[in-house]
């Protein structure tokens, strides 16, 4: 089943070609610009290309519009109305029969009438990526939930997705930490004493202070880095233990968030680094700057106008994240055979990734005509005071504490709303609502901007919130329970028949699900989907207000419209990483 947008695009492409045969010479790549109408009085969609065509064809825009409409008279079956407005806009309204039939297809098809791609792509998404021996904080929440929602989207659309956790698990920090633990926690290194991430974080902070202040400790830490790089057994065992403790703590968060991801840290790429540097040198891309091997790229300067370096080898012979990211992009293209690479990090790393992509192109690793690469930047999480979100003591909020607080807040709200609810059921609901509220609050903001974190706001049952959408789903589940309907039998014997204006509005919006997913897949903005779902819930509430379901001649057809709404709502929330519940 085609999207409504593509149905119209095909109609107008043909009508325009028939009306103006010379257009194929004047603009061989002409594509009609069609957008959803902003107001109900302008129909369902609007054709906006008449002005552009008028300039090309040297005609009056309204005459252009009239010529196109004249060619559409034989194509009216999907459309009930075509009107020319203003200087040449063409407003279109789909027939209720066409919409009803397409809703029947969506409702009965397991994949919503959305065709699977003829050639699925391999899409590699790099997200979350905390630094080992450090707590995950609210910034990691953004990368994690945005990355997970995009992965779920592409999986639903039928692509093969590899979810990678590019852990910061290598470098000087480990030398510092191992050297410090040898002095302060030898029993932990020997395996006699257990520890956790909280202790590792504390030791890391102390080791950093010591590294900055004590030259002798700095020397010992650097020796530990060398030992680690050379594969010495004791150093490797200490490193392995630190990684495992960190990953165990991260896994608790991923389980709470219902996020699946493959750990593949910086250390994975270590064997490839010397060859990458050598290859870049052979290709004449490397220049020596202050003893370091650097790549300088056009268009990347600092505030003083000096060229920014992509440093692929430090003056002491060591490697850094520039080298690792060059190795990673090479590996993802040549070893993983990725068709599309997506990196999700804070906006502060945008220049770094633009430079990596440009350098990969110059090195002939990346051919952007064959492989699409995207850096997906996101803004900061702010507190209600407008400053970077922190605890009351000024510390960065631990992500695990944030999630537990959201669950507890949701539990309190549910206790107040429904004191008779069984505790086990309430705790289950509180988890779905609390985690869902945090995810949705993040995803419903345009990721490029900053957003303000507020438990109170995100857990409200009104407005564009997870609770509002989850409650719309609960409402439909309640309708089905009250009617005790045999849904398979209703599906077999009844077809949707849109009559009332709010039925038509709801049905039209349901059928825009596919084109919404296409938009999100292209610009990687999850708020495309949250906006769609919020409008869906609002349109359902308007339908429910105006159109009685139970005990009317239209009971079964309206029940099917409720079911189509619930089906899309559930799938949309699943793509965002939220779970639906039948009761609340």
Curated annotation (Swiss-Prot):
PROSITE patterns listed in its UniProt record: AA_TRNA_LIGASE_I
Reactions catalysed, as given in the entry: tRNA(Arg) + L-arginine + ATP = L-arginyl-tRNA(Arg) + AMP + diphosphate
Keywords: Aminoacyl-tRNA synthetase, ATP-binding, Cytoplasm, Ligase, Nucleotide-binding, Protein biosynthesis
GO biological process: arginyl-tRNA aminoacylation
SMART domains with a match to the protein in the record: Arg_tRNA_synt_N (SM01016), DALR_1 (SM00836)
A GO cellular component entry from the record: cytoplasm
Top-rank EC class of the record's enzyme: ligase
Short motif 'HIGH' region, span: 130-140
Pfam (any one): tRNA-synt_1d
Predominant location category: cytoplasm
GO molecular function: arginine-tRNA ligase activity; ATP binding
E.C. number(s) listed in UniProt: 6.1.1.19
Subunit structure: Monomer.
UniProt family annotation: Belongs to the class-I aminoacyl-tRNA synthetase family.
NCBIfam families xrefs: argS
Name of the protein described by the UniProt record: Arginine--tRNA ligase
């Amino acid at each position: 089943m085609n999207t409504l947008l593509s149905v119209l695009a095909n109609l107008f492409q043909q009508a325009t070609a028939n009306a103006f045969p010379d257009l194929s010479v004047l603009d061989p790549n002409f594509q009609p610009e069609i957008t959803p109408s902003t107001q109900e009085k302008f129909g369902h969609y609007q054709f906006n290309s008449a002005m552009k065509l008028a300039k090309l064809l040297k005609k009056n825009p309204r005459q252009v519009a009239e010529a196109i409409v004249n060619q559409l008279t034989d194509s009216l079956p999907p459309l009930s109305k075509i009107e020319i407005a203003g200087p040449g806009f063409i407003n279109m309204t789909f027939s209720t029969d066409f919409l009803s039939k397409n809703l029947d297809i969506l409702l009965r098809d397991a994949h919503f009438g959305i065709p699977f791609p003829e050639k699925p792509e391999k899409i590699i998404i790099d997200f979350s990526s905390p630094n080992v021996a450090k707590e995950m904080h609210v910034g990691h929440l953004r990368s994690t939930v945005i990355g997970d929602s995009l992965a779920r989207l592409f999986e639903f659309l039928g692509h093969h997705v590899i979810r990678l956790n590019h852990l910061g698990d290598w470098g000087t920090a480990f030398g510092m930490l191992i050297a410090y633990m040898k002095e302060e926690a030898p029993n932990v290194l020997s395996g006699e004493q257990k520890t956790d991430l909280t202790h590792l974080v504390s030791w890391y902070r102390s080791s950093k202070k010591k590294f900055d202040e004590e030259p002798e400790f700095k020397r010992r830490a650097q020796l530990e880095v060398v030992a680690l790089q050379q594969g010495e057994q004791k150093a490797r065992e200490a490193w392995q233990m630190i990684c495992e403790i960190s990953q165990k703590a991260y896994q608790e968060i991923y389980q709470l968030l219902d996020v699946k991801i493959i750990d593949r840290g910086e250390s994975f790429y270590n064997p490839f680094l010397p060859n990458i540097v050598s290859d870049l040198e052979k290709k004449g891309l490397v220049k020596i700057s202050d003893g370091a091997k650097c790549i300088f790229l056009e268009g990347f300067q600092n505030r003083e106008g000096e060229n920014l370096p992509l440093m692929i080898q430090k003056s002491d012979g060591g490697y850094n994240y520039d080298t690792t990211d060059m190795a990673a992009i090479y590996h993802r293209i040549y070893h993983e055979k990725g068709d599309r690479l997506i990196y999700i990090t804070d906006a502060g790393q945008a220049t770094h990734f633009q430079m990596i992509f440009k350098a990969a192109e110059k090195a002939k690793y990346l051919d952007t005509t064959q492989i699409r690469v995207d850096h997906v930047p996101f803004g900061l999480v702010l507190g209600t005071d407008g400053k970077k979100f922190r605890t009351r003591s000024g510390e960065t909020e631990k992500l695990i504490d944030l999630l537990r607080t959201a669950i507890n807040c949701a539990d309190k709200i549910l206790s107040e709303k429904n004191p008779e609810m069984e505790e086990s059921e309430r705790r289950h609901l509180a988890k779905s609502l609390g985690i869902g509220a945090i995810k949705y609050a993040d995803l419903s903001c345009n990721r490029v901007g900053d957003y303000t974190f507020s438990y109170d706001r995100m857990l409200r049952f009104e407005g564009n919130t997870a609770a509002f959408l989850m409650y719309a789903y609960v409402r439909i589940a309640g309708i089905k329970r009250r009617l005790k309907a045999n849904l398979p039998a209703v599906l077999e014997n009844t077809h949707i028949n849109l009559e009332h204006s709010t039925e038509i509005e709801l049905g039209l919006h349901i059928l825009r699900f596919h084109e919404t997913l296409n938009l999100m897949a292209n610009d990687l903005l999850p708020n495309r989907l949250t906006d769609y779902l919020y409008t869906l819930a609002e349109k359902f509430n308007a339908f429910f207000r105006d159109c009685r379901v139970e005990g009317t001649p239209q009971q079964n057809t309206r029940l099917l419209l409720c079911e189509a709404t619930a089906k899309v709502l559930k799938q949309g929330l699943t793509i965002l990483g939220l779970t639906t519940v039948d009761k609340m």
